[in-house]
Amino acid sequence: MADDHIATYLNDHLAGSVVAVELMENLEAVYAGKPIADFIAKLRADIEVDVQELENLMGRLQISESRTRKASAWLTEKFTQLKLRLDDPAHGDLRLFESLEALSLGIEGKRSLWLALAAAAEVSPQLRIADYQRLRQRAEEQRDRVEAKRLEVAQRALKSERSTQAKSSSGE
């Protein structure tokens, strides 16, 4: 039973990584030629390394990848793109802000994965096969980078037109 739980948990996180990578590939295409595309490309490369770590861990634990979960994740990302496109058809700051927020939340989930596996490894010797502290630190560094960029974009995306108009009316 516990092995089934580990398989389910790891496959859920693998599916989440599919969503993240697809989202980043789309962002790179949408914002091609802009500095944010380079930021996303570097982040995607880092996350793909983590996906490989997760796949290697699953392989060592003899856990098969769930094609159903991966397909569902792919479909979820397509619906996410539709939602983002409807929210901001001009591919502006709102779309970028919401995408960065989704990535930030996903990276936090990955950090939680590594923390949970480290805790489980204390009582399950078969899980003592990865450097969870290093992986957690990588996730924290990625999250910090994404959060800094997300908050930068938030200043533009969530800027109130009323506050801008009020300042211009008052002569500021």
Located regions from the model:
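Acidic/histidine-rich alpha-helical segments that form the ligand environment
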Residues: 10-24, 77-124
